[in-house]
UniProtKB/Swiss-Prot annotation:
The keyword Oxidoreductase does not apply. GO terms for biological process: apoptotic process; defense response to bacterium; defense response to fungus; killing of cells of another organism. This is Periplanetasin-4. Antimicrobial peptide which displays antifungal and antibacterial activity. Has antibacterial activity against the Gram-negative bacterium E.coli ATCC 11775 (MIC=64 ug/ml), the Gram-positive bacterium S.aureus ATCC 25923 (MIC=64 ug/ml), and has antifungal activity against C.albicans ATCC 14053 (MIC=64 ug/ml). Has antifungal activity against C.albicans ATCC 90028 (MIC=5 uM), C.parapsilosis ATCC 22019 (MIC=5 uM), T.beigelii KCTC 7707 (MIC=2.5 uM), M.furfur KCTC 7744 (MIC=5 uM), A.flavus KCTC 6905 (MIC=10 uM) and A.fumigatus KCTC 6145 (MIC=5 uM). Signal peptide: none annotated. Keywords: Antibiotic, Antimicrobial, Apoptosis, Fungicide, Necrosis. It comes from the Eukaryota. It comes from Periplaneta americana. Induction: Up-regulated by infection with E.coli.
Amino acid sequence: LRHKVYGYCVLGP
Protein backbone atom coordinates (compact mmCIF):
# COMPACT_ATOMS: atom_id res chain seq x y z
CA LEU A 1 0.00 0.00 0.00
CA ARG A 2 1.28 3.42 -0.88
CA HIS A 3 -0.82 5.71 1.21
CA LYS A 4 0.93 9.01 1.74
CA VAL A 5 0.05 10.23 5.20
CA TYR A 6 1.40 13.43 6.73
CA GLY A 7 3.99 13.60 3.93
CA TYR A 8 5.36 10.06 4.23
CA CYS A 9 4.37 6.69 2.82
CA VAL A 10 3.03 4.11 5.25
CA LEU A 11 2.60 0.34 4.90
CA GLY A 12 5.14 0.04 2.10
CA PRO A 13 7.22 2.24 -0.20
